């Protein structure tokens, strides 16, 4: 038992540096948070088969981590895309990664679900910070609170993915990278990517936007958002979203003010009521399955130098962490049971522009999102640089 606990602690340390006192340590953490987030989403949404994942423990939470596998070309390709993301992150060019799901290999512009991972770069101090709508002005957190905040984000992803309706049986993936144009060289492309063509996308059904959470540091801020079909939200009721989120007007849910102030209720927030879901899991202990695997971040863990000790109390984080402290991965809830296909295509789907997110309903009932992304960097929309994968599978 002691040996198993030691191994789990070691695996957790592999993902999260003990301290965030330098920009390099912060970069390592952000890369690994991106890796864990993408891995959890693709696993829980049933994108790739079991063999494409390894296992790591984040304290008491067992997570699946995507890895290269000769029997799953799709996972190998996605790992290569992630390495391209790391290159752009390291150079401080990367602003947003969009991972999109679509169903027709010949029509990657019509998407069924997408996940946005946003990045900001700052340089305000030596300790990572975690903020929310109610904590934006609080002081920096200790390293222990930083770790709790990061794990909390992963737990939230798990809870959301476990309760969304299943994807279609046969889906494809594509990835888009967006940049801070004022600092990114016009000819820059990460390894494995090429210049993309921004055209706007069509969303199958009626889109719902969910703000999953963020983990800021003095050097980086990492945010996660999800867009899915309204029909898949049937299980996201009062037991998961608080009444406050459920009262959010539809007009606001469908308005993405993006980088202006993400937290001003333009998305459904993800402060899920996890207590109800934990009670359900306790009633069905036989459904919980722990699993195993590897990790796609290959950097050595940074040797951190001492950081100041900020013993700040954050009751909201503590409460949410305690509510989800027993969270397990339930196979009956997480896998959609779809037919696994190793075809992945690079499409022209795009994240919703904050000012241009006016929705137009087609006769077919699909929603046009115009155009993909014109963030707060520009007051006048113009074509923004973005990249898409060179190869499709």
UniProtKB/Swiss-Prot annotation:
InterPro entries reported for this sequence: HORMA_dom, HORMA_dom_sf, HORMA_MeioticProgression
What happens to this protein after translation, modification-wise? Phosphorylated at Ser-376 in a SPO11-dependent manner.
Gene3D superfamilies per the UniProt record, alphabetical = HORMA domain
GO cellular component annotations of the record: chromosome; nucleus; synaptonemal complex
Annotated spans, Disordered? 322-393
Q: Where is the composition biased (Basic and acidic residues)?
A: 352-361
Give residues where Phosphoserine occurs.
375
- Major place of residence: nucleus
Alphabetical keyword list:
Chromosome, Differentiation, Meiosis, Nucleus, Oogenesis, Phosphoprotein, Spermatogenesis
Give me any GO biological process, just one.
Answer: oogenesis
Where in the numbering of this chain does the HORMA domain appear? 24-226
**Residue window of motif Nuclear localization signal:** 382-385
Localization (cell) = Nucleus; Chromosome
How does this polypeptide assemble, per the annotation?
Interacts with HORMAD2. Interacts with IHO1.
The entry's function note states: Plays a key role in meiotic progression. Regulates 3 different functions during meiosis: ensures that sufficient numbers of processed DNA double-strand breaks (DSBs) are available for successful homology search by increasing the steady-state numbers of single-stranded DSB ends. Promotes synaptonemal-complex formation independently of its role in homology search.
Instruction: State the name under which the record lists this protein.
Output: HORMA domain-containing protein 1
**What organism does the UniProt record list as the source?**
Bos taurus (Bovine)
Q: Which lineage?
A: Eukaryota, Metazoa, Chordata, Craniata, Vertebrata
